[in-house]
Protein backbone atom coordinates (compact mmCIF):
# COMPACT_ATOMS: atom_id res chain seq x y z
CA UNK A 1 0.00 0.00 0.00
CA UNK A 2 1.88 3.05 -1.29
CA UNK A 3 0.54 6.14 0.53
CA UNK A 4 1.82 8.47 -2.18
CA UNK A 5 -0.10 6.64 -4.92
CA UNK A 6 -3.20 6.50 -2.71
CA UNK A 7 -2.95 10.21 -1.99
CA UNK A 8 -2.54 11.04 -5.68
CA UNK A 9 -5.52 8.85 -6.62
CA UNK A 10 -7.77 10.70 -4.17
CA UNK A 11 -6.31 14.20 -4.22
CA UNK A 12 -5.84 14.76 -7.97
CA UNK A 13 -9.56 14.40 -8.88
CA UNK A 14 -10.47 16.46 -5.82
CA UNK A 15 -8.12 19.30 -6.78
CA UNK A 16 -9.52 19.30 -10.33
CA UNK A 17 -13.08 19.27 -8.98
CA UNK A 18 -12.42 22.22 -6.69
CA UNK A 19 -10.65 24.07 -9.48
CA UNK A 20 -13.87 23.67 -11.45
CA UNK A 21 -15.79 24.98 -8.45
CA UNK A 22 -13.58 28.06 -8.49
CA UNK A 23 -14.28 28.61 -12.19
CA UNK A 24 -17.99 27.93 -11.48
CA UNK A 25 -18.02 31.15 -9.46
CA UNK A 26 -16.58 33.05 -12.41
CA UNK A 27 -18.92 31.81 -15.14
CA UNK A 28 -22.00 33.86 -14.18
CA UNK A 29 -19.89 36.99 -13.73
CA UNK A 30 -18.19 36.44 -17.09
CA UNK A 31 -21.40 36.18 -19.09
CA UNK A 32 -23.31 38.84 -17.14
CA UNK A 33 -20.35 41.23 -17.18
CA UNK A 34 -19.98 40.98 -20.95
CA UNK A 35 -23.73 41.30 -21.49
CA UNK A 36 -24.70 43.93 -18.90
CA UNK A 37 -21.48 45.71 -17.99
CA UNK A 38 -20.26 46.84 -14.57
CA UNK A 39 -23.72 46.90 -12.97
CA UNK A 40 -24.37 43.25 -13.76
CA UNK A 41 -20.92 42.09 -12.66
CA UNK A 42 -21.20 44.13 -9.45
CA UNK A 43 -24.62 42.65 -8.69
CA UNK A 44 -23.29 39.09 -9.04
CA UNK A 45 -20.30 39.85 -6.82
CA UNK A 46 -22.38 41.48 -4.08
CA UNK A 47 -24.87 38.58 -4.15
CA UNK A 48 -22.19 35.87 -4.13
CA UNK A 49 -21.86 35.58 -0.30
CA UNK A 50 -25.45 34.28 -0.19
CA UNK A 51 -24.58 31.65 -2.80
CA UNK A 52 -21.48 30.79 -0.79
CA UNK A 53 -23.58 30.45 2.38
CA UNK A 54 -25.72 27.74 0.77
CA UNK A 55 -22.72 25.93 -0.68
CA UNK A 56 -20.93 26.15 2.68
CA UNK A 57 -23.93 24.60 4.42
CA UNK A 58 -23.83 21.69 1.99
CA UNK A 59 -20.06 21.33 2.28
CA UNK A 60 -20.13 21.44 6.09
CA UNK A 61 -22.92 18.90 6.51
CA UNK A 62 -21.57 16.65 3.76
CA UNK A 63 -18.03 16.69 5.14
CA UNK A 64 -19.23 16.20 8.71
CA UNK A 65 -21.40 13.23 7.84
CA UNK A 66 -18.91 11.60 5.46
CA UNK A 67 -16.04 11.87 7.96
CA UNK A 68 -18.07 10.14 10.67
CA UNK A 69 -19.35 7.56 8.18
CA UNK A 70 -15.81 6.72 7.03
CA UNK A 71 -14.46 6.46 10.58
CA UNK A 72 -17.38 4.32 11.76
CA UNK A 73 -17.19 2.09 8.69
CA UNK A 74 -13.49 1.53 9.30
CA UNK A 75 -14.02 0.58 12.94
CA UNK A 76 -17.40 -1.19 12.93
CA UNK A 77 -18.27 -2.09 9.33
CA UNK A 78 -20.62 -0.73 6.67
CA UNK A 79 -23.88 -1.84 8.29
CA UNK A 80 -23.20 -0.02 11.56
CA UNK A 81 -22.06 3.12 9.72
CA UNK A 82 -25.07 3.41 7.38
CA UNK A 83 -27.03 5.61 9.76
CA UNK A 84 -24.58 8.47 9.18
CA UNK A 85 -25.37 8.54 5.46
CA UNK A 86 -29.10 8.72 6.15
CA UNK A 87 -28.62 11.36 8.85
CA UNK A 88 -26.49 13.44 6.49
CA UNK A 89 -29.12 13.36 3.74
CA UNK A 90 -31.85 14.31 6.21
CA UNK A 91 -29.79 17.23 7.51
CA UNK A 92 -29.15 18.39 3.93
CA UNK A 93 -32.90 18.33 3.34
CA UNK A 94 -33.54 20.33 6.52
CA UNK A 95 -30.86 22.89 5.57
CA UNK A 96 -32.33 23.20 2.06
CA UNK A 97 -35.82 23.84 3.42
CA UNK A 98 -34.57 26.39 5.96
CA UNK A 99 -32.41 28.21 3.40
CA UNK A 100 -35.13 28.43 0.75
CA UNK A 101 -37.86 29.37 3.22
CA UNK A 102 -35.81 31.84 5.24
CA UNK A 103 -33.59 33.54 2.69
CA UNK A 104 -36.30 34.13 0.07
CA UNK A 105 -37.88 36.84 2.23
CA UNK A 106 -34.52 38.34 3.16
CA UNK A 107 -32.79 38.82 -0.19
CA UNK A 108 -33.68 42.51 -0.29
CA UNK A 109 -32.51 43.38 3.26
CA UNK A 110 -29.34 41.30 2.78
CA UNK A 111 -28.44 43.17 -0.41
CA UNK A 112 -29.12 46.52 1.30
CA UNK A 113 -26.90 45.44 4.18
CA UNK A 114 -24.09 44.67 1.75
CA UNK A 115 -24.38 48.10 0.14
CA UNK A 116 -26.43 47.39 -2.99
CA UNK A 117 -28.40 50.37 -4.28
CA UNK A 118 -30.17 51.36 -7.48
CA UNK A 119 -29.51 49.15 -10.52
CA UNK A 120 -27.10 46.91 -8.59
CA UNK A 121 -29.85 46.19 -6.05
CA UNK A 122 -32.43 45.40 -8.76
CA UNK A 123 -30.11 43.08 -10.67
CA UNK A 124 -28.80 41.46 -7.49
CA UNK A 125 -32.32 40.74 -6.24
CA UNK A 126 -33.31 39.20 -9.58
CA UNK A 127 -30.28 36.93 -9.29
CA UNK A 128 -30.75 35.94 -5.64
CA UNK A 129 -34.50 35.30 -5.89
CA UNK A 130 -33.85 32.53 -8.43
CA UNK A 131 -30.76 31.20 -6.62
CA UNK A 132 -32.60 30.91 -3.30
CA UNK A 133 -35.53 29.08 -4.90
CA UNK A 134 -33.00 26.48 -6.06
CA UNK A 135 -31.26 26.30 -2.68
CA UNK A 136 -31.85 22.54 -2.42
CA UNK A 137 -29.76 21.85 -5.52
CA UNK A 138 -26.91 24.06 -4.30
CA UNK A 139 -26.86 22.35 -0.90
CA UNK A 140 -27.32 18.75 -2.07
CA UNK A 141 -24.79 19.12 -4.91
CA UNK A 142 -22.06 20.20 -2.50
CA UNK A 143 -23.26 17.92 0.30
CA UNK A 144 -23.39 14.54 -1.45
CA UNK A 145 -20.04 14.85 -3.24
CA UNK A 146 -18.03 14.26 0.00
CA UNK A 147 -19.99 11.03 0.55
CA UNK A 148 -19.05 9.89 -2.95
CA UNK A 149 -15.38 10.68 -2.32
CA UNK A 150 -15.42 8.77 0.96
CA UNK A 151 -16.77 5.75 -0.90
CA UNK A 152 -13.77 5.76 -3.24
CA UNK A 153 -15.61 7.60 -6.01
CA UNK A 154 -13.28 10.58 -6.48
CA UNK A 155 -13.35 10.29 -10.27
CA UNK A 156 -17.14 10.03 -10.32
CA UNK A 157 -17.37 13.08 -8.04
CA UNK A 158 -15.22 14.95 -10.55
CA UNK A 159 -17.45 13.76 -13.40
CA UNK A 160 -20.71 14.90 -11.81
CA UNK A 161 -19.24 18.28 -10.91
CA UNK A 162 -17.91 18.68 -14.45
CA UNK A 163 -21.32 17.81 -15.91
CA UNK A 164 -22.94 20.54 -13.83
CA UNK A 165 -20.21 23.01 -14.75
CA UNK A 166 -20.56 22.38 -18.50
CA UNK A 167 -24.35 22.61 -18.23
CA UNK A 168 -23.96 25.96 -16.51
CA UNK A 169 -21.69 27.32 -19.25
CA UNK A 170 -24.03 26.26 -22.08
CA UNK A 171 -27.12 27.62 -20.32
CA UNK A 172 -25.38 30.87 -19.35
CA UNK A 173 -24.59 31.41 -23.02
CA UNK A 174 -28.21 30.73 -24.00
CA UNK A 175 -29.99 32.50 -21.15
CA UNK A 176 -27.73 35.56 -20.84
CA UNK A 177 -26.31 36.16 -24.32
CA UNK A 178 -28.95 34.66 -26.63
CA UNK A 179 -32.23 35.14 -24.74
CA UNK A 180 -31.05 38.25 -22.84
CA UNK A 181 -32.57 37.15 -19.52
CA UNK A 182 -29.97 39.03 -17.51
CA UNK A 183 -29.00 38.08 -13.98
CA UNK A 184 -32.13 35.97 -13.52
CA UNK A 185 -31.03 33.89 -16.51
CA UNK A 186 -27.54 33.48 -15.05
CA UNK A 187 -29.06 32.32 -11.77
CA UNK A 188 -31.32 29.85 -13.58
CA UNK A 189 -28.29 28.44 -15.41
CA UNK A 190 -26.47 27.98 -12.10
CA UNK A 191 -29.44 26.27 -10.45
CA UNK A 192 -29.95 23.89 -13.39
CA UNK A 193 -26.23 23.10 -13.43
CA UNK A 194 -26.38 22.20 -9.74
CA UNK A 195 -29.52 20.13 -10.42
CA UNK A 196 -27.54 18.08 -12.96
CA UNK A 197 -24.81 17.51 -10.36
CA UNK A 198 -27.38 16.53 -7.73
CA UNK A 199 -29.09 14.03 -10.02
CA UNK A 200 -25.75 12.46 -10.91
CA UNK A 201 -24.81 12.24 -7.24
CA UNK A 202 -28.10 10.54 -6.32
CA UNK A 203 -27.63 8.13 -9.21
CA UNK A 204 -24.29 7.13 -7.67
CA UNK A 205 -25.84 6.60 -4.23
CA UNK A 206 -28.52 4.34 -5.70
CA UNK A 207 -26.29 2.51 -8.21
CA UNK A 208 -23.62 1.75 -5.61
CA UNK A 209 -26.32 0.75 -3.12
CA UNK A 210 -25.20 3.06 -0.38
CA UNK A 211 -27.34 2.85 2.77
CA UNK A 212 -29.73 5.70 1.99
CA UNK A 213 -32.80 3.70 3.06
CA UNK A 214 -33.26 2.18 6.49
CA UNK A 215 -33.82 2.94 10.13
CA UNK A 216 -33.45 6.48 11.48
CA UNK A 217 -32.99 5.32 15.06
CA UNK A 218 -30.29 7.32 16.78
CA UNK A 219 -30.76 10.23 14.38
CA UNK A 220 -30.57 12.97 17.03
CA UNK A 221 -27.21 11.86 18.50
CA UNK A 222 -25.79 11.36 15.00
CA UNK A 223 -27.07 14.77 13.89
CA UNK A 224 -25.34 16.39 16.85
CA UNK A 225 -22.08 14.65 16.00
CA UNK A 226 -22.36 15.70 12.37
CA UNK A 227 -23.08 19.30 13.37
CA UNK A 228 -19.98 19.40 15.57
CA UNK A 229 -17.72 18.15 12.79
CA UNK A 230 -19.53 20.27 10.17
CA UNK A 231 -18.79 23.54 11.97
CA UNK A 232 -15.14 23.50 10.87
CA UNK A 233 -15.55 22.92 7.09
CA UNK A 234 -18.52 25.30 7.07
CA UNK A 235 -16.49 28.03 8.74
CA UNK A 236 -13.43 27.49 6.55
CA UNK A 237 -15.53 27.61 3.38
CA UNK A 238 -17.62 30.64 4.32
CA UNK A 239 -15.11 32.75 6.27
CA UNK A 240 -13.54 34.40 3.17
CA UNK A 241 -16.96 35.91 2.47
CA UNK A 242 -16.61 38.19 5.51
CA UNK A 243 -13.82 40.14 3.84
CA UNK A 244 -15.64 40.05 0.48
CA UNK A 245 -18.77 41.59 2.03
CA UNK A 246 -16.78 44.36 3.73
CA UNK A 247 -14.73 45.18 0.63
CA UNK A 248 -17.86 45.21 -1.54
CA UNK A 249 -19.63 47.57 0.83
CA UNK A 250 -16.72 50.02 1.02
CA UNK A 251 -16.20 49.77 -2.74
CA UNK A 252 -19.83 50.74 -3.40
CA UNK A 253 -19.56 53.65 -0.97
CA UNK A 254 -16.27 55.02 -2.30
CA UNK A 255 -16.08 53.97 -5.94
CA UNK A 256 -19.52 52.84 -7.07
CA UNK A 257 -20.26 49.92 -9.37
CA UNK A 258 -16.99 50.31 -11.29
CA UNK A 259 -14.98 49.69 -8.09
CA UNK A 260 -17.07 46.63 -7.18
CA UNK A 261 -16.69 45.23 -10.71
CA UNK A 262 -12.93 45.78 -10.54
CA UNK A 263 -12.63 43.94 -7.24
CA UNK A 264 -14.85 41.13 -8.57
CA UNK A 265 -12.11 40.22 -11.07
CA UNK A 266 -9.55 40.07 -8.24
CA UNK A 267 -11.91 38.03 -6.04
CA UNK A 268 -12.44 35.49 -8.82
CA UNK A 269 -8.69 34.86 -9.09
CA UNK A 270 -8.40 34.47 -5.31
CA UNK A 271 -11.33 32.04 -5.29
CA UNK A 272 -9.58 29.68 -7.70
CA UNK A 273 -6.44 29.62 -5.53
CA UNK A 274 -8.51 28.99 -2.41
CA UNK A 275 -10.39 26.15 -4.09
CA UNK A 276 -7.17 24.47 -5.21
CA UNK A 277 -5.87 24.42 -1.64
CA UNK A 278 -9.22 23.16 -0.35
CA UNK A 279 -9.13 20.41 -2.96
CA UNK A 280 -5.92 19.01 -1.45
CA UNK A 281 -7.48 18.92 2.01
CA UNK A 282 -10.76 17.41 0.88
CA UNK A 283 -8.97 14.85 -1.27
CA UNK A 284 -6.87 13.61 1.64
CA UNK A 285 -9.76 13.53 4.14
CA UNK A 286 -11.32 10.19 3.04
CA UNK A 287 -7.99 8.41 3.47
CA UNK A 288 -7.29 9.92 6.88
CA UNK A 289 -10.80 9.10 8.11
CA UNK A 290 -10.59 5.54 6.83
CA UNK A 291 -7.16 4.83 8.32
CA UNK A 292 -8.16 6.44 11.61
CA UNK A 293 -11.26 4.24 11.81
CA UNK A 294 -9.20 1.14 11.00
CA UNK A 295 -6.71 2.04 13.73
CA UNK A 296 -3.86 2.63 11.23
CA UNK A 297 -2.75 5.86 12.85
CA UNK A 298 0.73 5.84 11.30
CA UNK A 299 -0.76 5.76 7.80
CA UNK A 300 -3.24 8.50 8.71
CA UNK A 301 -0.38 10.68 9.95
CA UNK A 302 1.63 10.00 6.79
CA UNK A 303 -1.28 11.09 4.58
CA UNK A 304 -1.58 14.22 6.70
CA UNK A 305 2.10 15.03 6.19
CA UNK A 306 1.85 14.48 2.43
CA UNK A 307 -1.14 16.83 2.27
What are these regions, as identified by a protein language model?
Residues 1-14, 69-136, 178-231, 288-307:
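Short alpha-helical transmembrane segments in multi-pass integral membrane proteins
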Residues 5-66, 231-252:
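Signature of the first transmembrane helix
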Residues 2, 9-13, 43-47, 126, ...:
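Loop-to-helix entry region at the N-terminal start of transmembrane alpha-helices
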Residues 41-101, 138-157, 262-307:
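Small-residue-rich hydrophobic transmembrane alpha-helices
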Residues 62, 130-149, 157-168, 186-201, ...:
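Short runs within selected transmembrane alpha-helices of multi-pass transporters and secretion channels
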Residues 15, 19, 23, 27, ...:
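Generic alpha-helical transmembrane segments of integral inner-membrane proteins
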Residues 23-42, 111-118, 174-181, 241-272, ...:
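Helix-terminus/linker motif at the lipid-water interface of multi-pass membrane proteins
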Residues 210-241, 247-267:
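Acidic, glycine-rich loop-and-beta core segments that form the ion-binding/anion-interacting portion
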Amino acid sequence: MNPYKLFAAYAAPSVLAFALSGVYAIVDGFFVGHSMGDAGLSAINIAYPVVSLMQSLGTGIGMGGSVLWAVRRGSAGSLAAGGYVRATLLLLLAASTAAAGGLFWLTGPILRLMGAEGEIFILGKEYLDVIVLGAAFQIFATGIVPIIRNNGGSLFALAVMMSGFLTNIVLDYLFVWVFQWGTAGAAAATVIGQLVTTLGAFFYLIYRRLPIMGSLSGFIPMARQIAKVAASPFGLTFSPMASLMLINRFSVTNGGEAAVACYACIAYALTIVQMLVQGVGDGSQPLMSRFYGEGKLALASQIQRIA
